[in-house]
């Protein structure tokens, strides 16, 4: 198996893909491309793009959307969905709470979408805008029939609390959407996807590199240790939900109590709420005392201590002031540097270091996941550097 710069991979021979010559802003007539039981995937964002993850699927009898994000380039660009698409969609399936997957939900509802918005309870708690018609996934029943021709299974992705993948059966077709996917995370559980058969799989492939997560985690731990060995405090800006708990757990398991770990209130609250819940955290974590991670006022600093700040892009003036007023403070960025904060400028000026933490899949891991299943068509997403051959695929 080989994967090109941007790949659409078929694991066994099928009919050729039928690209659209039309712009994404219009709905294609069903009889133009669709034969009996054929469906189309419209990439409304998320492939060769900065965030804005959104996929529209339609067939003769059903249409739905998976994720509705805005761009992360500072422009808050909306998905490329026509008014007809928005009105026709019966369901919106949300994989997790991050803005690049949920930022356009309100826009869809304001422009004619009236169907249920499916998401996990944690995702619902985390998002700011609450959809008008929300259907919460039941964690005790990971299979759901929405009508006689549309049903789904779902599972945990390991990306953050509440993040899920979807395996959807509709009109005789089977579709898999990985969401932001991470097996073997240091904190979050993942329901590893194995042995599925699908006509279409849209899979996280955020990192173009060909290594795997364990190498990336080691690089982050090594960078942290190098910074701490000089007895300086270490600051790690992170999102409110996601990799913060994963990195904190790696540091605790690697360094023990040699370097005390402090957290912004929002992140420590996450730790207190889910750190001892077996649904979210790995078994070995459940017995750790809560005080292994300390509460932090986002002001005080001590040399040789680790500080997690819930401001991943350094958007807040208070965060930047903390860095500017403490030249001894080491700053380590570990995620994408977006356009709506100042994190990128701190990195480009040399004030912050950067080592990528693996909370998505590398291209190698995308290939691994595809090889562990029987996916006829694989469309990778979440990589701004890799553009698809077309915005529309028939399967």
Where are these regions (language model features)?
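C-terminal regulatory/interaction regions
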Residues: 291-395
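Glycine-rich phosphate-binding "P-loop"
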Residues: 203-218, 282, 347-360
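Metallo-beta-lactamase
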Residues: 121-163, 169-171, 276-304
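Hard-cation-handling environments
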Residues: 223-332, 381
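Catalytic core of the metallo-beta-lactamase
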Residues: 56-59, 143-200
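Pre-active-site segment of Zn-dependent metallo-hydrolases
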Residues: 35, 47-94, 98-99, 103-115, ...
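Active-site neighborhood of phospho(di)ester-bond hydrolases with catalytic His/Asp-centered motifs
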Residues: 66-68, 89-100, 105, 117-120, ...
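Short, Lys/Arg-enriched N-terminal segments with co-localized hydrophobic residues
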Residues: 19-38
């Amino acid at each position: 198996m080989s994967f090109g710069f941007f790949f659409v991979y078929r694991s066994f021979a099928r009919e050729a893909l039928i690209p659209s010559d039309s712009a994404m802003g219009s709905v294609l007539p069903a009889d133009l491309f669709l034969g009996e039981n054929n469906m189309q995937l419209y990439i409304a964002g998320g492939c060769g793009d900065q965030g804005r993850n959104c996929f529209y699927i339609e067939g003769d009898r059903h249409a739905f959307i998976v994720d509705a994000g805005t761009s992360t380039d500072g422009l808050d660009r909306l998905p490329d969905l026509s008014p007809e698409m928005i009105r026709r969609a019966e369901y919106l399936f949300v994989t997790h709470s991050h803005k690049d997957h949920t930022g356009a939900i309100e826009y869809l509802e304001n422009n004619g979408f009236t169907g249920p918005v499916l998401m996990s309870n944690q995702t619902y708690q985390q998002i700011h805008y609450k959809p008008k018609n929300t259907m919460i996934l039941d964690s005790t029943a990971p299979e759901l029939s929405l009508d006689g021709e549309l049903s789904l299974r779902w599972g945990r992705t390991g990306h953050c609390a509440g993040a899920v993948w979807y395996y959807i059966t509709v009109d005789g077709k089977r579709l898999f959407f990985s969401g932001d996917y991470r097996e073997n995370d240091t904190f979050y559980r993942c329901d590893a996807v194995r042995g599925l058969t699908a006509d279409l799989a849209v899979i996280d492939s955020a990192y173009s590199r060909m290594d795997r997560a364990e190498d990336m985690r080691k690089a982050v731990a090594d960078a942290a240790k190098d910074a701490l060995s000089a007895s300086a405090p270490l600051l790690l800006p992170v999102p409110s939900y996601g990799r913060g708990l994963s990195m904190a757990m790696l540091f605790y398991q690697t360094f023990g109590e040699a370097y005390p770990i402090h957290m912004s209130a929002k992140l420590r609250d996450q730790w207190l709420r889910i750190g001892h819940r077996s649904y979210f955290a790995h078994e070995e974590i459940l017995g750790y005392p809560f005080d292994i991670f300390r509460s932090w006022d986002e002001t005080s600093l001590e040399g040789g201590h680790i500080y997690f700040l819930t401001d991943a892009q350094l958007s807040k003036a208070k965060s930047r002031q903390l860095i500017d007023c403490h030249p001894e403070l080491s700053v380590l960025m570990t995620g994408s540097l977006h356009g709506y904060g100042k994190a990128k400028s701190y990195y480009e000026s040399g004030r912050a270091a950067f080592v990528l933490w693996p909370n998505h899949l590398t291209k190698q891991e995308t290939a691994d996941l595809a090889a562990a299943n029987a996916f006829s068509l694989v469309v990778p997403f979440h990589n701004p550097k890799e553009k698809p051959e077309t915005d529309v695929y028939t399967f």
